[in-house]
Amino acid sequence: MEFGVTGAKIDEIGFIAHAENLGYDYCWATDSHLIRSNPWAVLALAAQQTRTIKLGTGLAIGGLRLAPVAANAIATINRLAPGRTFIGLGTGNTAMRTMGQPPMRIKPFAEYVRVVRALLRGEEVDYTLDGTTHPIRFQNLDLKYIDIEHPIAIHIGGFGPRAQALAGELGDGLITGIPRGGTLPEALANVRKGAARAGRKLDNFKVTALVNLLMLEPGETLQSARVIAECGSAIMANVHYLVDLVKETGQEPPDYIAPIWQEYLDFHNARDAATRHQALHASHYSYLDPEEARFVTPEMIKAFCIAGHPEEIIEQIRGLEDQGLDAISFITPLDQQYAITEKFAHQIIAKL
């Protein structure tokens, strides 16, 4: 099992180097331009201040930049950190919704992935922009502006069956979430469907999950203020995702959110309609909005987190590994990132 952290703040690159020293395997840079630092700047600095940790996006959003630009960006980072970069690609839940826009649809996203994949493989590919199609490829490779000689893995973000199938069809890996991406067996079944559609084998395919981890202190309960502060922002990020999903698709919310669902909708709908989309995602994986703390109940913590004492968390992680999970990512509140990553490294990773 590999473990990854998330670095999103341009002036705290030392956190990524610290995670490397603690034994973490990789680091994501997030791509939410209205609430975080620019991911490519973060990765460029991290590449120069680290030696072994793998670096990439979690996730680079298709709707924010042209596919050739995204391919160039990660290939440029690969020039600084050859052989230890990857690119995670996604349709853009938070990044697009903070602009009041929907995520990219699956069909254009699949085309986006196809172009990025071909360019990073050094291939010529037909590229369409504004209705005009031309063949394109990276040029002047001998001048070493970028590096595509060292392979760059493409991981596809997918919480639903179509995106998960697309990962199997075009990706080198899947990035999903627990629980909002469904169970691991369900996700893997979707991946295999996509691979079968493309006639691909899934050799070296990597499954990564964004997981909310919560380590309890001796005698601590799920109602403690420390617990709520530590896991609250991650739990509410999942709630925010579901609010948009249910609104747009009309599907029923999952059972695990039922205890707070209507109360949260009433709270959210009372916000100013013109800026509601901003308020919903402002705290995204960074801090717990004090007005939302009341929704972080023991029932919600149990539904959204791998929680327990170290030996209990280790047992649950091993169970996920047995189901086919290869890597775990987690995102800590900004003001606790050093303490939580250190504690997890010493009490969990070191014992696995």
Annotated model-derived regions:
Residues 26-49, 61, 93-96, 178-181, ...:
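Glycine-rich, proline-tolerant flexible connector loops at the mouths of alpha/beta enzymes
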Residues 1-58, 152:
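N-terminal beta1-alpha1-beta2 module of alpha/beta enzyme domains
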Residues 1-10, 60-68, 148-159, 213-216, ...:
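Active-site mouth loops of central-metabolism enzymes
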Residues 102-145, 189-319:
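An alpha-helical appendage that flanks or caps ligand/catalytic pockets
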Residues 8-19, 70-73, 158-166, 309-319:
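Short, acidic/polar
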Residues 23, 46, 77, 116, ...:
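Conserved, mostly hydrophobic/aromatic
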Residues 40-57, 112-115, 119, 344-352:
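Alpha-helix-loop-beta-strand connector modules within alpha/beta enzyme cores
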Residues 3-5, 27-29, 55-58, 85-89, ...:
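Hydrophobic faces of well-ordered beta-strands that scaffold small-molecule active sites
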